[in-house]
Amino acid sequence: SLPREGETLEDIRADIGDCMRCPLCCEGRTKIVHTEGNPQARLMFVGEAPGANEDAEGRPFVGRAGQLLNKIIEAIGLKREDVLIGNVNRCRPANNRTPTSAEAAICKPFLLREIAIVRPEVIVVLGNTALHNLLDTKEGITKVRGQFKDYKGLKVMPTFHPAYLLRDPSKKRETWDDMKKVRDYLNKTKAER
């Protein structure tokens, strides 16, 4: 799923249109939640799917998990406007269930085109759904978190989803360790430019 020459994030949004490609369109979606942020971002965050707050506002990570993500971004010296934030799926599954692999497969090509356009230096995958869809691995987040992985020459850092951290705050320390690795890598590559 390669982007076309000169394609922009807005072009992808237009291609998605008023999407009816999978059952999520009719299951409880109010708004399609598109990837948002800096199209020249060096850092991208990818989550699972919108929740109720995101569905209502049409923006990714705006609920309690989003507030925590904002704090994580600020803790590594960046602002939300500096990064790109999206999800594997753009429509909310009913009752916040995990999207099926078939639903994810329909949305995933749009995410991969966005990554190909922006080419962020680091992609932080938040939780198992993002991990499994970007890296095509069956390993769980607990096993691979904190280790840089490769996606087409880009660094990928798997870590816990902020919603999980709200349920289990004891994992915040590990997430902070992961994010320090991201910060240090971005600082190092910036110094080398």
In which residue ranges do the predicted regions lie?
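A polyanion-binding, active-site-adjacent surface
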Residues: 1-193
